[in-house]
């Protein structure tokens, strides 16, 4: 029994070492027509990028900082620093631009843990006029947060929130809780947060989360 336990521990240790080596290894290429080079360094746990123009890129750090890379140089000071919950898969997770507005998706504590979308005005390469755009569920789980934002061809904002291990009706759990904005792709009017008018599940109740759903079961 002792020999078996020792052997098992050795195998587990080797697996962890191999996984860590793969995680931090240099990228490898199988296409000889491609090359890999370092573009910028000094960023901590990047989660998303947003190209503002050909010279300026916003890079999100999981711990709440929005960093600006301008002409290939990482600027010393963050454009925005949010206080976020970084446990497991929580944190500053997504960014998107719609016109002259920039949206950020982050997990925050405001009485309870929630996923919050912030809206900013883009002024040059600065983010101004912070406002809370929309609050979404952030519990029960610390993983499966989602957090990605995108803009549709018709100018609406997409937001993805994971199911948070909630196991609701929108995950085909018959006796589960009703939809609550989790486990879904939302399509949102970027001006006022209302649901896009062509969303497929709109009903008579204006407060029904399904009005915002573009897809569910995420």
Where are these regions (language model features)?
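Bacterial N-terminal signal peptides
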Residues: 8-17
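Surface-exposed intrinsically disordered loops and tails
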Residues: 170-176, 203-208
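Repeat-solenoid scaffold signature
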Residues: 207-218
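Acidic, Gly/Ser/Thr-rich repeat motifs that build Ca2+-stabilized beta-propeller blades
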Residues: 26-168
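Positively charged n-region of N-terminal signal peptides that target proteins for export
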Residues: 1-4
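Beta-propeller blade signature
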Residues: 116-124, 173-191
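Blade/loop signatures of beta-propeller domains
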Residues: 22-35, 74, 194-205
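Secondary-structure boundary elements
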Residues: 125, 151-158, 187-201, 206-207
């Amino acid at each position: 029994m002792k020999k078996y336990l020792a052997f098992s521990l050795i195998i587990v240790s080797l697996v962890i070492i191999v996984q860590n080596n793969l995680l931090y290894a240099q990228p490898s290429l199988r296409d000889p027509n491609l090359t890999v080079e370092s573009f910028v360094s000094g960023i901590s746990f990047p989660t998303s990028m947003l190209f503002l123009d050909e010279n300026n890129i916003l890079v999100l750090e999981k711990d709440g900082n929005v960093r600006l890379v301008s002409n290939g140089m990482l600027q010393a000071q963050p454009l925005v620093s949010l206080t976020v919950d970084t446990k497991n898969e929580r944190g500053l997770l997504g960014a998107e631009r719609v016109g002259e507005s920039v949206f950020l998706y982050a997990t925050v504590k405001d009485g309870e843990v929630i996923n919050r979308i912030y809206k900013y005005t883009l002024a040059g390469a600065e983010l101004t006029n912070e406002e809370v755009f929309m609050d979404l569920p952030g519990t029960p789980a610390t993983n499966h947060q989602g957090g990605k934002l995108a803009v549709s061809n018709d100018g609406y904002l997409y937001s993805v929130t994971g199911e948070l291990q909630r196991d609701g009706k929108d995950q085909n759990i018959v006796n589960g809780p009703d939809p609550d904005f989790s486990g879904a792709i939302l399509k949102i009017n970027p001006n006022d947060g209302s649901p896009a008018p062509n969303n497929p599940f709109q009903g008579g109740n204006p407060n029904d989360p399904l009005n915002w759903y573009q897809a569910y079961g995420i």
